[in-house]
Amino acid sequence: MTPDAARPLTGVRIVEISSFVAVPLAGMTLAQLGAEVIRVDPIGGAADYHRWPLTDSGESIYWAGLNKGKRSVAADMRSPDGQDLVQRLIADSGVLITNVAGRQWHSYEALTRLRPDLIHVEISGRADGGTGVDYTVNAGVGFPMVTGPAELAAPVNHVLPAWDVACGVYAALAVVTALRHRDATGHGQQIGIPLENVALATAGNLSFLTEAMVNGNARERIGNSVYGQYGQDFTSSDGASFMVVALTGRHFRDLTELTGTTKAVAALADTLGADFADEGERYRHREALTGVFTEWFSAHTGEEIAAALKETSVLWDRYQSFAEVVTDERVTANPMFTALSQPRIGEYLAPGLPMSIDGSYPPATPAPALGDDTAAVLCDWLGLTPEEISALTESGTVA
């Protein structure tokens, strides 16, 4: 495999004007695929430049995590000169990804006057043009009402910014498909991705919305159970927690044999008039089944449970904290992770692209500091002389 085979977007140039999660993730994904991605920020940094978590010296671990492999330009995007300069960078690249909506100077209409075949991908909060972030979009699409303990009445937010992550992947996909379209037709595209629509589409595609429309009822809150299947968390005698899932008949039979409950489960089925070969029946009577299985889990240590589960087809894993995960072989021996020396942050294992291409994982490379590449990009992309760049720096147009 040639080096370019693992970086299929080599030669593509992209300008990113962004903050927070979705667009930075899209830009980083495209960079990991080989594109030259220039993140353009205001002088002093966008709203996410100092976002937590921070190092003891105040550097943003978060910012470094979502901007690996990019180049950084800092410009005064409120000034006409700064806007003109960034417009020229966008026109040169032919691709803009942004979640900074409502800025006329980098709108599709304004930029296509400079680059008619421009690919313009803009993430917004809501389809009606309103503002929204992952945490507020999530509140309005139903998921907090089915998250958390079954007995709880109040909404529960999930910690993972799921809609931002999904939206970022959609944005990267949009760029790749638009590049394909431009190669085939010579035309660019204007692509809008409302964050709210990503959440609503997911809720619909996974049947949460459709169930309410067709059956007339909302999904119930079931805690750590798995809807429509048998899946439950269990705790060992020494306090270790496990998630155990039996999706198939074989999984379920192995679980009953492992726990020595085959006869007890058969007796329960007779009492309830249930057929546990049916996944719906296993789900419907999940609480009774959990009561049968709990005795075995609570009588064994975490190590004993893990060793026993490894010998079966049952799907499972042990709950771990992030501090435990980083010492696990799934990180330390995973070829997706690269030992990265990140300036101002330190050395750590950083994930690259989470997919192998012809057996190779594109490795992680460091994130730039704000404005690290301003002069080089202005020279390489726009052909500005050192004197011209110096004048722009002295005037406060770039940094």
What kind of region is each of these model predictions?
Residues 1-184, 369, 375-399:
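N-terminal helix-loop segment corresponding to the beta1-alpha1 unit
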Residues 168-188, 205-212, 256-268:
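Oxidoreductase and adenylate-handling cofactor-binding alpha/beta cores
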Residues 215-231, 299:
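Active-site Gly/Thr loop motif
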Residues 152-160, 183-199, 221-224, 274-275:
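Conserved Rossmann-fold dehydrogenase catalytic segment
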Residues 37, 310-324, 384-389:
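Short, well-structured beta-strand/strand-turn elements
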Residues 161-176, 195-205, 247-251:
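Mid-domain beta-loop-alpha active-site segment that forms a flexible
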Residues 1-13, 235-237, 324-399:
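Terminal low-complexity tails and localization/encapsulation signals of metabolic enzymes
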Residues 230-312, 316:
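Aromatic-enriched alpha-helical interface/lid elements that frame and gate functional surfaces
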